[in-house]
Regions:
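Carbohydrate transferase catalytic cores enriched for Leloir-type hexosyltransferases
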Residues: 1-310
Length: 310
């Protein structure tokens, strides 16, 4: 349906349909391989002689949900895997998490990292909420508790000369919680600015003093790599997939205690030069996550799976 348009990025062409089974049958073609590119997607096909490939992005529900909701999501994933012939995951972390909680039997399981669109040559626009002389830190993501944005608010007491802009949806309970924490901490240099456009996001990456990402649950960690492409210093948690994705191109928080987080940032910024070797190395590393490599790996896998039909 139209609501999924753009979900895989701007580099993909989209065809909007309302009734996938009906529309696919109308094409009159035999489908040899069906790739469900996200375990959350509703669109699925099963037929005799058809190979089913499933991509699992994360098992975050195991850590976010409780009781019957947790069990329901796990059973659903197990059922999808049972009906799949091959599984891909987006990081080694997700692979190990999957193997820990789901018996996949002898089904092939492969890690294929996400490709990332290069936006560095795309349009940029300074957001209205940023003043000309502002020195600022930046973070962006789903406004959910797993992102740990609340840890950054008391830390900003140690950076009176900087602002922190938290970008993400306003209509969540966690957003309201962030506002309450800000009021309780009496911090006036933190702004929750809501969602921003792609052009504004690009500008923020390019002009931020640092990108802060204390998330505790990630299957991959797209924003950290996006930030690196703009020579932006990245500070990250050591949770889940982030050390695997950032490697030595980020500085990691050893503690979530505000003063220690601030110390980590100050030390990291002291050795950072946007045009220096560390920044250029991080950018080059980030560029290795591209759609050419991503598509090449999937095309090779498609050929391998289709060859097994013959």
């Amino acid at each position: 349906t139209e609501k999924y348009r753009g979900i895989l990025g701007d580099a993909v062409d989209y065809v909007t349909v309302e009734h996938i089974d009906k529309d696919l049958k109308a094409l009159g073609h035999k489908i040899d391989l069906w790739h469900t590119t996200d375990q959350l997607f509703i669109a699925r096909r099963h037929a005799k002689g058809m190979i089913n490939l499933l991509t699992v992005h994360d098992l975050n529900f195991l850590h976010e949900k409780k009781g019957i909701h947790r069990i329901k999501n796990l059973l659903k994933l197990k059922w999808f895997i049972k009906r799949s012939d091959c599984i891909t995951v987006i990081s080694e972390y997700v692979k190990q998490d999957l193997l820990k909680h789901v018996n996949i039997g002898k089904k092939p399981l492969r890690v294929i990292y996400n490709g990332i669109q290069d936006t560095t040559k795309e349009a940029q626009r300074q957001p209205d909420f940023v003043n000309v002389n502002d020195k600022f830190f930046f973070t962006i993501g789903q406004t959910r508790k797993k992102k740990n944005f609340h840890l950054l608010i008391p830390m900003m007491k140690y950076f009176p000369e900087y602002k922190l802009f938290i970008c993400g949806k306003r209509r969540t309970s966690y957003y309201r919680e962030l506002k309450e924490i800000k009021e309780h901490c009496h911090v006036d240099n933190v702004e929750m600015v809501g969602e921003i456009t792609n052009e504004e996001r690009n500008w923020m990456y390019a002009h931020s003093e640092a990108f802060l990402f204390p998330s505790r649950l990630e299957g991959f960690g797209l924003p950290v790599l996006e930030a690196m492409r703009y020579n932006c210093k990245v500070f990250s948690s050591q949770c889940t997939s982030l050390p695997e994705i950032c490697k030595n191109h980020a500085t990691y928080f050893d503690s979530f205690e505000p003063e220690k987080m601030a110390k980590t940032i100050k030390e990291g910024l002291a050795e950072w030069d946007k045009n220096g070797e560390l920044a250029l190395a991080a950018k080059e590393y980030s560029m290795s996550y591209n759609y050419d490599k991503y598509m090449k790996q999937y095309i090779e896998l498609y050929k391998e799976l289709l060859h097994s039909l013959n």
